[in-house]
Structures are given as C-alpha cells and as structure tokens.
C-alpha cells in the first residue's frame, strides 16, 4: 500500500502505513491506547488529534516528512501544593501565547493565578522558576522543543491541555550547561529537558541496548548523575531512573532533570531511533532485571516518608563510580544518602551500585541530615537480595548495631546530624549484637574538580589529631599540617599549589590513608 487516505476514523490500536494523508474537512483521532507509525510521509489538511490520560498516551511516529498542524491533548497534573507537572511540548512550532489562550478560553483547563499562567521556565543560572503572565506571554514565542517547563491544569478539571503544532520527524537537540561548576550554589548543574516527540522515547539500556537517551548522551552528563530525574508531583522530590532501573520509556512531552558535566553549553540529542510506540505512564519502568538485586531503605518521620536510598548489585560493577548505574541525589543536602566505597569524591548517592559479590560482604557509609530533637526512623522498604543477608545499621556514636531485618532504626538526635562518618550499613551473613566491638571508622580525602581546596572528612571519629602530608610525584613534600578532631570535615586550601598530580597521606594513630589527587 503506497498511500492511506482517511476521511473519518478513530484509532484505538496500532496502525502502520507507508504514507498517510488526512484530507481537508475530515477527522482522524488516535485514542489514548492507540498509535500510528508511518514509514513514509504524513500530510494533514484536516483534523488530526492524539489523546491521553494520566497513565496512557497515544503516539505518532513519522519516518519521512510531516506537514500540517495536529493536536495533542496532553494530560498534565493539577495545580496544588507540591503538585504541578514538568512538561515539554510534544509538538513543534507551538506558540506559547496561542497555547495559553486556547487552554484558558471557555471551560478553562490551564490553571491561572491572577495575571500569572501555570506555565513557566526554569533558569539554572539562578536556580529560579518564572511563570508567564498576561504581560509577558505575548512576546514568549514558541515552546522550545526538547525543553521542559513547569505546568499545571486546573484543580478538579479534566487535566487535559491542548498543544497544536507539527510532528517532529528528525533528530532534535537541546542545549544544557553546568552553572554550578565551582559548587558555589549560585547556579545549578540541573537542566530541565523534555521528550520532543509525540511518541515514547527509549530511556535506558534495558529499553534498548544502544538507541536510548542515556547511552546516546552519556558523554554530556555528569558521571555521578548519569540518570533521568523525574518529578514525583507529591512533595517528595525526584525519582531517579538509570541503567539500574527496568526498561525506561519516556512519554510524549515528558520533562525531567539531567545534570550537565560541562561549564560550556553542550547539546543533548533525541534521535529518531529512540522513538517507540510502546509505553504507559509518564515515566514507565519495567521490573528490575532477574540477574540483579536491590535493597531500598527509607527514612520516615512518623508515617511520612522523607527520603530513600537504594543499593543495587550486578555482576561486573565495582565499588567505585559506575556511570549510568550509580546516581547522586538530586539534593546534596538530602535526608538520606550513601557514599561510594572507592573513589569517594564527597557525592551523596541515591543509588549506590556495586558488584554482586558484595551482597554479603560490604560496609557502606551513609549520610543522615536531620535537625536536632526530631524523631525519625530508617527501615527496609525493598529486600531484593539473598534471604540470608543481614542488614545492620551501625551508629558508632551510640555504639549500636540495629538489625533492620527485624525492626527499624530509631533516633531522636541531640544535635544536628550531617556529613559522613557516624552511620554505616553492614551487609553480612554474620550476626552482631550491641556488645560486639564493631566500630567502623571513616577517614576520607578528596578534591572536587572545581574546588580550590582539599576536603578531609571523618576527623571527629579519630582518637586524636590527623597528620596530613602532600607530596609531588617525585616525592618532594609540598605541604604538612595537623588537623584536630573537633570538627568532622575540614579543608586545606590549594590556591598556592601548582596544577598537577599529587599524593596525599593521612595518618591517624596506626591508620594510614594514601591517595592520589589531581589539582587543577
């Protein structure tokens, strides 16, 4: 069949055609469960509509040329505290002014507040959100395809917002940048981007081995944050998806955060080979693969979940950084994070991936950030590891070992909790009690690429001073100092030290730590 010409039709299944033409005065509607795949060209002179709801999204894939505007009735979360949605336009050449006019006329579906529309941009240079208003929307131009926006529908409405534009049928790019290179908190590494196609996009290697978002863009993302960060719309923050997740597919127009590794602008790619008609919810993920294991711990205040951290085990992974499997937390001051066992550069991880051989033989530092005087508890949420593995939470200040398999760890801290060095997760086949003399002692040193200082942490857990020496590669001593144990984390300036590769040596009692540092 060379060409399919349709007058009036409703598609609630998968339709494939070589070419598709919708004639003037005719209607073609794709139900939320339907999809259209065109190997040739698409032309619309009539009315072509794609529908969706909260967890089902129709799609169209065009391999050839595409002409004529179509409509995508896209579901968007309602306005409300900690709700809203992150959305990009699933169509090209969509006027923002026309969009807000169409969705606030008659029975309005786009939320408003006075002169402000519930559509806005994120600026990572200043870490701010700005909504369009009646006075600014006229000059807003078109939605930047591939860019994400904050958006919300009216409370109690249908949740459907209509986008009118053309089908993108070629590879799309979107600029990203790291505006927090010096960790100054003036800007952020996070960029809000979106699936630019009116079809699903393969997100990770479990969805497609090579034609997926994370694999194609791996060299553009920060190695410690090589993941898709999806907004939860419930006040809990962001859920992280990477190659440790099941098959990930991104819905049409779905927006999400990614972390750039470059202080200069760089372009991410959404290739046509990533497109697929297969999917489901906004961020749809299949089950964790059978040859991998996971343990998820959650922190609660009463019955309210505050945060979680995930440990993932798979053959071939290391105790150091595994880009695409390990993933740093979106908020580096989060309530619960873990640290790498090797190559620890001070990043708090929400997903800590390691080899399968470590399931019964690992001690992982965790970071708990909590205010003094507030009860909290930590317990096992998902136990997807060996049945005989004991999970202990060590508190080396209280001298306790809590077996999480049997009950939660509970604490009302007398002082503010922060930084690494006090709490550890033990995965072991052994059995401990509080009478056993088990005290894990973290002593770590690192220099972040863009910092002008060396960070030493774990000092408060040392019995006395820690001696620090820095050597050049030829053995010449560059620096020598002693740090007390009154403050857990301390820094040493590198502003007067030349760029190069050095060796740093820490000695605390009988314990010696030697590590290579690169000073830029």
Report the location of each language-model feature:
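Compositionally biased Ser/Thr/Gly- and acidic/asparagine-rich
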Residues: 125-144, 148, 152-488, 495-499, ...
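Tight coil/turn sites that cap or link beta-strands
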Residues: 23-27, 31-33, 39, 83, ...
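Extracellular, surface-exposed repeat architectures
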Residues: 53-100, 177-190, 195-198
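Extracellular beta-helix/beta-solenoid repeat scaffolds
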Residues: 18-79, 164-166
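Bacterial Sec-dependent N-terminal signal peptides
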Residues: 1-23, 433-435, 491
